[in-house]
Amino acid sequence: MKKFLTIAAVAFAAFATVSCDKENGTENGGEDNKPETKKVLLHLASELTEEAEFLYGRSFEYDENGKLSAVKEVGDWGSYNLTVTWNGNKVTFTEDNGDVAYEWTLNEKGYVVAKGDYTYEYDAEGHLTKIVEDWGEGPYVASIITWENGNMTSWSKEGEAEDGSGNARVKRQTYKTDLNKGGIFTAFTEKSSLKKWMFELGFFGVASKNLVASDKWDDRENGADFEYRTDADGYVVAEVKYWEGAIDDETYYIWK
């Protein structure tokens, strides 16, 4: 890779000592006898390996009750900080200059049900299933997300088929047998107006049970494939995306 921010380089150095069996997700003899471990996400960093390279690192801080209190991002372009405040069923992200970046309304399970012009619906298991947009001309369904055996199997861009038919454009996922212990979101609906970390901190429902193997549009011949490295407890520390056999981007995670 051509360039790393210091924090991403440190993260990668920590990950480099960890290896896993790509077939079963276990490390040197398996995890069957290991106690269950619960961790929170402290940091993620990502690098696109295309010509227009972009690298960022984002860290998360929590208060004494385990609630998110701050999000700090650093990139080649500078830094960006958000302070997180909780008030009943509202959570607000405020920039250093006092501007409100995000204000969300939560349901009784702590999942976001409203954000600006978007509303979000979930099934009984806590999976995000529908996104509705309303830009002032009445609500319309923007995305339908389907689930099977605890895994997201497809998400749609409703009415956006590239053939002009007005049908949905659909992206489908396949899965490995490896468990998704950290609840990462390798694949998520792009119609959500959300970022990867917002899903991975648990604000938008339950993640897929297993790790994503592939991700492909119905109207495309090729899609993306994914491989992972995990720590000793089975949490993903590196997610590698391949496009047509070449590395497209990599995401690194630090857990505690």
Predicted feature descriptions by range:
Residues 1-4, 21-22:
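Positively charged n-region of N-terminal signal peptides that target proteins for export
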Residues 5-12:
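Sec-dependent signal peptide hydrophobic core
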Residues 16-19:
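C-terminal motif of bacterial Sec signal peptides marking the signal peptidase cleavage site
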Residues 22-256:
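Buried hydrophobic residues that stabilize the cores of well-folded domains
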